[in-house]
């Protein structure tokens, strides 16, 4: 049996999970080949969940990070199909937990995409980067949000709070004062998560300033806040207690709202200050140890402002109305899009101008040709006119051209009257009388 056949049989045995057949084929020298998609035996064993087969192949030295033609590793296969035991086996054998395929998606992305909660927990346990972004600028949190998977959302949110952001360039730090609660109605408690970006707030004494890191990496944070605010039950005004780590801002009765705009790195952070309601009687809503969850505050104009207690890790985000959707585009892409649009318009104008010039040149060329043809016709007409005039001048000379032509046609002998008389005299003088020749036609021409 050839090596090619041995390699094909090894792929099929790995797909079916036939451990003994895999051992026999490798003992007979079967190469670690791949199919036309670049799928290795370990890929197939991981995809179909054959733990023992994968273990045999790893012990035999198969590459644990082998890549298909779309750069998928066996860990991608196992995570996408929900084989947690295979995932753990691969990670314990040194597989790259943050390997990215052609779409720049990690195993955590694929596990979240297919709702495999146990695989997500396992990957996070072994250090998967929850801040990794795919080719479509989406993190695992964004995918879980699109799939409406609340359990995975909670897991990822906790992991993001505990894990240092691996993409610090996506966060623009903004220095603000100690967090406040801005309210003009009811305070809604968020039961779990807020955003996919890792943010930190630090506080010392009550009057010290805190630093809040904002991130524009997640485009669906606003939708998360709105959905969670609707899902959470509003707290009654009678269930309020004093929040020692928060400061309440009460707006002036005359100036009901003040808007402060803080810009940093091209971003805009809007703080809305409205008529405040002191939180003096909250008893059951806030735990004795302090506020354990973030708060979202709804103001009258439909905006929502998230605020957190001092020392808690969360993100402060302003949700504006749908008119601000245009600002969701990455700020670095807007000038590029405008430049591309301008260049396209300029190229269109240049093309149209060149086309018009070509048409004008073609019209001029045809007009020149028509002008030459007209001049030539005029010259020919002039020549015909001159010929006719010459012929008309030759007619009055007294020469009968038609008669001459007729004489030429019958081959007649043309003699004058004088010649006839002389001829008759000669004949009569010699013979006396003579008859004219009968075979010759004679014509008298008088001048």
Curated annotation (Swiss-Prot):
Residues 418-447 are annotated as: Disordered. Transmembrane segments: none annotated. The keyword Coiled coil applies. Pfam families: Ank_2 (PF12796). Residues 345-395 form a coiled coil. Keywords: ANK repeat, Coiled coil, Nucleus, Phosphoprotein, Repeat, Transcription, Transcription regulation. One of its GO terms (cellular component) is nucleus. One of its GO terms (biological process) is positive regulation of transcription by RNA polymerase II. The modification Phosphoserine is found at residue 253. One of its GO terms (molecular function) is transcription cis-regulatory region binding. It is found in: Nucleus. SUPFAM superfamilies: Ankyrin repeat. SMART domains: ANK. ANK repeats lie at residues 5-34, 37-66, 70-99, 103-132, 136-166. InterPro entries: Ankyrin-SOCS_Box, Ankyrin_rpt, Ankyrin_rpt-contain_sf. May function as transcription factor capable of interacting with purine rich repeats (GA repeats). Heterotetramer of two alpha and two beta subunits. The C-terminal is necessary for the formation of a heterotetrameric GABP-alpha-2/beta-2 complex, and also facilitates homotypic dimerization. Interacts with ADGRB2. This is GA-binding protein subunit beta-2. It comes from Bos taurus (Bovine).
